């Protein structure tokens, strides 16, 4: 899946004109898997950017660029909500909702080979998908965040939700 994410990430970058980042966490960096190679794409033609300052993020450029990115945030959230890498999987037990990020999702599913009894939101693309997050939060009593490395998503959720729902994770 990580291979496909990079492949599709480059397409997304070309479409939006924005760079993409592949967040390599420890567990992913130390794992191996067979991949099915995709068809190689033809080389892009080389051309100069209309605004090369978008790639030179000195403080003066970064402040202006930040405004542009904020204006496009809804577009990025919509792409995240429609991404095949973010998906909501319903479960019968609504006492707990699980947000599983990246390889944390694989570890969760290894422990539930017959399917997880709790609703799970698999996160593989950012920004966080609002629609799926609200679906999980509105149907569950509390949220558990599974992520590798720093508690990035957990911090985001605690600030983003702000509605009194309990969020558990590394910060507990």
Annotate each predicted stretch with a short phrase.
Residues 2-172:
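Flexible, low-complexity linker and terminal segments
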């Amino acid at each position: 899946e990580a291979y496909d994410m990079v492949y599709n990430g480059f397409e997304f970058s070309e479409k939006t004109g924005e760079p993409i980042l592949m967040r390599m966490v420890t567990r992913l960096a130390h794992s191996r898997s067979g991949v099915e190679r995709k068809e190689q794409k033809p080389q892009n033609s080389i051309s100069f950017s209309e605004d090369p300052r978008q790639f030179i993020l000195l403080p003066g450029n970064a402040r202006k660029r930040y405004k542009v990115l904020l204006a496009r945030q809804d577009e990025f959230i919509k792409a995240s909500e429609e991404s095949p890498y973010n998906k909501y999987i319903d479960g019968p037990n609504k006492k707990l909702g699980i947000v599983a990020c990246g390889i944390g999702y694989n570890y969760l599913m290894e422990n539930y080979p017959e399917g997880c009894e709790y609703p799970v939101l698999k996160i593989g693309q950012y920004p966080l998908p609002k629609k799926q997050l609200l679906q999980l939060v509105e149907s569950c009593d509390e949220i558990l965040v599974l992520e590798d490395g720093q508690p990035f998503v957990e911090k985001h959720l605690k600030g983003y939700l702000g509605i009194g729902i309990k969020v558990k994770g590394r910060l507990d």
